[in-house]
Amino acid sequence: MEDNLPPELKVLLRRAERVILVANNPAISAGDFDALALGPRDVVVSFNTAVKAELLSAETVNVFVHGYHGQEFHFFGLPCRPCITRLFEQSPDRCFTLLVGVVNPMSALPRVAIYEDRIPLPTLLDYPRMRPSGKPFAGPSTGFNAMVVFDWLLGRPGYTYELFALGFSNEAGTLWNGHAWDYERAWMHASRVRVIALESAGKRWWWPLRFKGKKAK
């Protein structure tokens, strides 16, 4: 898994203080991003269409994860929207792409990681395949694939970042019924991933823990 990552991204991840996974949740606001006080040692991970890409900054490391749509033979969110393309143009050495669920051989491009379906980590290999009704699940969500990979990296030498999830707390939006969300949420809450509540959900319980008394914005 680690070998799949571009060498430049591995260097930045070893230096990172935080890796923050951002869900495609419409309830995420500019205030939620401002409250994180993001800086150059933060890695921000977005998924597929990256609906909150307008809030991203070229100051951070940005990773864009795209899942493969097997029935329509394309990656969700590609080609990127103009606001994402601008980030790659402004900060090409700090923007990376992860392609998940690749089913046919592909040649890696600079700053692009390729993961085949399915990523050989126990949490993903054990992912439910069938519903009680007998209807199959589509497999792990793009965000869950990335979350498990970044959590796994924390067990490898040299990676010491804190892992956060923003917008994975179900404040708004809908969940596509093709994924085993109960399995994904149960794993997340039992893992070392720290779920950040959105401003709309009330007081941020994690704020004093992360910023050790610094005044919230």
Predicted regions and their residues:
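Metal-ion/cofactor- or nucleotide/acyl-coenzyme-handling active-site neighborhoods
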Residues: 1-217
